[in-house]
Amino acid sequence: MKNINPTQTSAWQALQKHYDEMKDVTIAELFANDSDRFAKFSATFDDLMLVDFSKNRITEETLAKLQDLAKETDLAGAIKSMFSGEKINRTEDRAVLHVALRNRSNTPIIVDGKDVMPEVNAVLEKMKTFSQAIISGQWKGYTGKAITDVVNIGIGGSDLGPFMVTEALRPYKNHLNMHFVSNVDGTHIAEVLKKVNPETTLFLVASKTFTTQETMTNAHSARDWFLKTAGDEKHVAKHFAALSTNAKAVGEFGIDTANMFEFWDWVGGRYSLWSAIGLSIILSVGFDNFVELLSGAHAMDKHFSTTPAEKNLPILLALIGIWYNNFFGAETEAILPYDQYMHRFAAYFQQGNMESNGKYVDRNGNAVDYQTGPIIWGEPGTNGQHAFYQLIHQGTKMVPCDFIAPAITHNPLSDHHQKLLSNFFAQTEALAFGKSREVVEQEYRDQGKDPAQLEHVVPFKVFEGNRPTNSILLREITPFSLGALIALYEHKIFTQGVILNIFTFDQWGVELGKQLANRILPELGDDKAISSHDSSTNGLINRYKAWRA
C-alpha cells in the first residue's frame, strides 16, 4: 500500500477549484438541468439493493475528479493488497482479512505463506456442531435441562456487531432468548441476571486475549452468580463457552477448551462479527442464516474487488463522503434506517467508522492538515424526525445523511409500512428541494389567509433545501442483504482510509484512557485524599471518595 498525502495530488487541487465552482450550485438546479439525473446517479446491486446518490451536490465532473483522486492515491493497489493478505495494518504488523471469514468461494487466501481457509472452515464447522446441539436441546445444563437463554459477554466489536445483527434479524430468530452485556457498570450484568435461570443459561465470553477488563469483570461476576446456585465448579463447563485464543486462561476459568472458538490476529474487533464472535448470531438465527449473512457480505466483497471504480458502490459512497468532509467542511454523517429492527445499525457503524478513521496521524507518521473520519450518528426513522431532523432541515450545519429502508416489511400491519416509506421518500425530497418563501406565501393564500398579515411567521416556514442525502432501498432485510449492506459500509470506510492516507485497522486512541484507569484503580481502594494528578482529577477523585462513604 502506498503512502500518499491526498492534498499533494493534482486531483485534490482540481477538486478544490471544482468546489469553488460548485459551492453555490443547488441540488434543485442539478435536477432541473438533467431529466436523467436519477438514472445517471444511482445503481443496483444484485437486484436486492438500490443506491440512489442523485440528491447530492455533485455532477459527473465531480465524480470524475474524485475518481482521479482514488487513482492518484492507488486505491486499486490497496484493495488488492488487502484481499491478498498483505500486512496492511503496519502499526500492528497484521494482515486485514475479515473478507476471508466470508470467502464462500474457498479460493485460497495466503497469510505468511499459509492458506487460512482450512482453519476458517474448521471453526465454522465447530460452531455449526455446537450451535445445533444448543438449539436442538441436545446440550443439557447441569440439572439436565435444555438451554433457554444465551448471554453474550463482550465489549466493542465483541458486542456491537452481534447485538446489531441479532436485532436486525429478529424475524429469523428461534426460541432462544439472547442477552448482551458489555458495560463494566455492574448495573448492566445485574439487570440481565435478573432475567435468566442459572440452570438454563449459556454464557459466551468474547475476548480474544481473555484479559479485557470489562469483559472479564462481567464474566467473573456471571461465574460467581452461577456458582451460588450450581455449587460445583465442574458445572461451569456446561454453561460457559469462550470466543478467544487464550486456551490457558480459558481453561483456568473453568471452560472446557473444546468449547473455545478461535479467531486470528488478522481479524479486527470491529470487523469480527463474521468470525467466532458471531456465535451468538448463529445461536439466535441458526447456522444456515449465518451462512447467508456471510454469503451476502462475500457478494459485496466480489463487487468491491472486481467492479470498475465508476460503478463501485463502496467507492462511490466513500468519495462522496470525502467531498463533503474535506471540501464543504461537513463534520458529521447521519445513518437513518427506516426499519425498527435496524435500530443498532448507526451505533455499530459509529464504532466502525470512528474507531477506524478517527486518526490525526497519517501512514508516514505525520500529523495531517486535512479532515479524516467524520462523526457518525443516527436513529431509526421516524423517531429521528421528531428529535433531531429540525437541525438537519433548518440548522446551520451540513449533515449528509444515508437513508436506508426495505421495500418489503417483516410485519405488514395495516398501512404501517406505507406510512413509514412515505416518510422515507418525503424526507430526502424535502432535504434536497426545500420550500421557498413564495411557496409558503401561496400556501397561506390557498388557505384564504393574507401572507402580509403573517409576515412575522413566513421566514420560519422556509426550507432552504440543498441538504445532501443517499437513499439505500433494499428489497427486503434478509441475512443475505444485511451481510451485503454491512460489507458495503466496511469497504466505504476502508476506501476513505486509503485515500486519506491513514491506518484504518488499528485503534491506538483507546489505549491511553485504559492505561490511566489501571493507574487510578488502586487509588480508589482506600479513603486517603489523592494529590498525584492534576487539580481537576484530584478534586473529582476526592469528592467521589467523600460521597461514597
From Swiss-Prot:
The keyword Ribosomal protein does not apply. Pathway: Carbohydrate biosynthesis; gluconeogenesis; Carbohydrate degradation; glycolysis; D-glyceraldehyde 3-phosphate and glycerone phosphate from D-glucose: step 2/4. Its main location: cytoplasm. GO terms for molecular function: carbohydrate derivative binding; glucose-6-phosphate isomerase activity; monosaccharide binding. Its EC number is 5.3.1.9. InterPro entries: G6P_Isomerase, G6P_Isomerase_C, Phosphoglucose_isomerase_CS, SIS_dom_sf, SIS_PGI_1, SIS_PGI_2. The active site is at E355, H386, K514. The keyword Isomerase applies. This is Glucose-6-phosphate isomerase. It is found in: Cytoplasm. It is an enzyme of class 5 (isomerase). One of its GO terms (biological process) is glucose 6-phosphate metabolic process. PANTHER family: GLUCOSE-6-PHOSPHATE ISOMERASE (PTHR11469:SF1). Keywords: Cytoplasm, Gluconeogenesis, Glycolysis, Isomerase. It catalyses: alpha-D-glucose 6-phosphate = beta-D-fructose 6-phosphate. Catalyzes the reversible isomerization of glucose-6-phosphate to fructose-6-phosphate. Belongs to the GPI family. It comes from Salmonella paratyphi C (strain RKS4594).
